[in-house]
Amino acid sequence: MLRNMVESRKTSETDIRLDLNLRGSGVYAFDTEIPFFEHMLSHIAKHGLIDMDLKLRGDIGIDCHHSVEDTAILLGQMIHTQLGDKKGIFRYGNFTLPMDEVLTTVAVDLGGRFYFKYTGPALDGKFGIYDAELTLEFLQKLALNAKMNLHVVVHYGENRHHIHESIFKALGKALRQAIAIDTSAKDQIPSTKGMLE
């Protein structure tokens, strides 16, 4: 497993540079011009103990869609690459997180297959220039490019900010569990197939 990676993604719509360390301490720095997105990403970093340094410029004069989507693509690809053959990791992680009146569960499987499912209230409205529906776009593209199963269930809750924050915090916690090294099986691939994509 690689400890640190720096990758870029540049299109006619976005220019992104990400420094990522899955074995970090939760240190982060963001320069995206999308404050709410930075706030959500900080929860993945902090609660996942993932170091992230992200610089993003996108066509936010139109909207934030391309910026959020392309960040998820790059982050997912880097997670998949950095995990390598996945030897020794727990592979699975799940966390149920309370945040005031909200209760959210996130479960992940880093087994090399994509699946995404969200169950909960509609994510709509805006947070500054960030469209709330982009959270689902981010999660789907992250799961697709990290080649992981990602299930998100918001059991109940009302405050839109709390709902979003609980999702990203629980995602960080679940990823932290899944990428952690199982000291009882640190030289084993966590699959009866003997390999993971």
Curated annotation (Swiss-Prot):
Classification of source organism:
Bacteria, Pseudomonadati, Spirochaetota, Spirochaetia, Leptospirales
An example Gene Ontology biological process: L-histidine biosynthetic process
Report the coiled-coil segments.
none
- Would you tell me the protein name for this molecule? Imidazoleglycerol-phosphate dehydratase
Q: Organism's domain of life?
A: Bacteria
Q: Which HAMAP family match?
A: HisB (MF_00076)
Instruction: Give the pathway annotation.
Output: Amino-acid biosynthesis; L-histidine biosynthesis; L-histidine from 5-phospho-alpha-D-ribose 1-diphosphate: step 6/9
One GO location term (cellular component)? cytoplasm
Provide the gene name from the record: hisB
Which Pfam family, any one of them, does this sequence belong to? IGPD
